[in-house]
């Protein structure tokens, strides 16, 4: 099929649950032909695609935003294996899975929730970035207390977090109350 050329500048779509996908690296400026809409687009998605068909070609952010890529390829952009609280409406989960750019983690990405809604993904962070966010630090501490880690080991682990390292935290913000949430993943 022929690729349709676009000549007017294109403003990136807005994503409620991933407000800065260029800043997080999930979308990059790279002119490509989108496999879904077959148009030349100035940006491409670099995050995970969960689909039966292996999709190695570029998907544009516009086809993620309008849900056409998810529909066309029976795909999601975040793994559906994470637990969604009962108070989160199904349409919110659908928006995160099918109309929001995902992100790449070390082992298993998960989308955090708060106040009956999905939280906004702000990006990977390290110890220096979470140092001034006591609510995010508390979330990390609580996560590792759940694994029965002693307090001193948790604090040592938090100090090793690096946004580009082998242990990384992923920062979110509640869209209702503004609390910062985080979880850590490591290789």
Curated annotation (Swiss-Prot):
Gene Ontology terms describing biological process: symbiont-mediated suppression of host innate immune response
UniProt note: phenotype after gene disruption: Grows normally in liquid culture, traffics into host (human and mouse) acidified compartments early after phagocytosis, suggesting it no longer arrests phagosome maturation as well as wild-type, impaired growth in mouse macrophages.
Highest taxon in the source lineage: Bacteria
Name of one Pfam family that matches: UPF0167
Protein purpose: Probably plays a role in host phagosome maturation arrest.
Entry's family note: Belongs to the UPF0167 family.
Protein name: UPF0167 protein Rv2295
